[in-house]
Amino acid sequence: MKALSTADYIVFLVYFIVIVGYGLWIYNRKKKETESSNDYFLAEGSLTWWAIGASLIASNISAEQFIGMSGSGFKLGLAIATYEWMAALTLIIVAVFFIPVYLKNKIFTMPQFLNQRYNGTVAMIMAVFWLLLYVIVNLTSILYLGALAISSISGLDFNLCIAFLAIFSIMITLGGMKVIGFTDVIQVFFLILGGLITTYLAVSLVSDEFGGNGILDGFSILTTQAQDHFQMIFSKDNENYAELPGLSVLIGGMMIVNLNYWGCNQYITQRALGADLKTARGGLLFASFLKLLMPLIVVIPGIAAYVLYQHGGFQTEMLQDGSVNPDRAYPVLLNLLPSGLKGLSFAALTAAIVASLAGKANSIATIFTLDIYKKTIRPEATEKKQVQVGKITVVAAMIIAIMIAPFLGIDKKGGFQFIQEYTGFVSPGIFAMFILGFFWKRATSNAALFATIGGFLFSIFFKFLPGFADLSFLYEFGFAVPNSAGIYEIPFLDRMGFVFIICILGMYTISTIETRNGVKTNGLEVDASMFKVSPSFTVGSLIVIAVTAALYTVFW
């Protein structure tokens, strides 16, 4: 691959100076305000709707999207965009039903909600779990994939890239949630602009290769040259059905993935929890619109790379250890860009990685400081001391991630799949615990413990069940398909759906028995007026729903 030119490094350096300079300016201007732990962790009351929306997208779109989803676009096609388009609908649900509950009860963190709704045992178990999940799964995978992409594009040493990303992310994070929120506004601009330019040039290259004229011809050529890559819903005989199993991407496990991620995720929700309800909802709606556009940036380039590869392009660039590695699609396309533009796109990718790392590190610090340190280690800690502990936690988490990232086998599994699989072992139980905790006053603490621990154990059970039982009878219903060895396995998303149903039924049974025996619960007061939305929000939501329905109708 071509190395970065001097012009590329200049563009990248300008970006680096702008981001760091702006972050430091915000930090110094708000230094007194960040002495408050609420302001450090949440940017309380200071983020606008557009800053919240931009921060949500910048923190969500990272290496696993740019590298992983482009790679999935190369392999699976447009169907992988269901993660983005279903997220657009999910954000509306979260804005209407979840955020009002958090704000009314002044919830700063997810463990705080669990402590208030259930008890300290449930909250502490989940706080420890989230710390382990964020550090071992999320932080490491983003760090590893980000370094891999930057190393592939720039030619720099992989370990040096990991160190650079960690240090840069720490610098951004130490300013607190306020710095992250407002630097995200700059980063999301570079991110989307660079991604759109990459998509434009990639599709234009397809057009040129096939004698077309412009980007519209290029897109038309993509749909004809790779018809199998423009199907949103796979049938059972599709070789990729196990990854995206039919209608489960609409009404099954995919909704659990998205609702858990966007509604029960400290890393995401804290961007909206530092605002009033109207502002928070506006931010989530803005993010929903941006989600509809994300496949243009993270999926279409992968499909373009696939078409070019199938017709003789990138025959060596796409190879890794002698076989095709779909995750190389986006770095390959970036290396086709002219000097300057390549540096801009490289900066956009780096922006996505750093924003996600910084946000994740801040969430780790928030949970450890407010829900472990403050409650069990030093309850008398001052506001200033809590902020100091949070900053130390950021550095410690990043050091741990640097040390273990190369040894987790992320490269073999693929970053996007790595994150989805390992979070999927616990997300059904977490979502069941949250959804009943929100809207059913009789849910008890023991029922929540069942969902937390039982959900994890049942996920393991269904994962390894094919090794002990013949599941071919499930094929007729689309709940099992044969792998390369002929063994029938339950698709990942269906497995999540099964576990979620078990957790809901288990929680209902345990709660019903306990409440009949006199066990008291801490049910939340849910008022229907909490869920009323403004006319402008209603109109915006209907537009998102209509566009999503149209996309699925066209590409079904």
Q: For the regions a protein language model found, what residue spans apply to each?
A:
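Membrane-embedded helix-loop-helix hairpins and adjacent transmembrane boundary segments
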Residues: 1-556
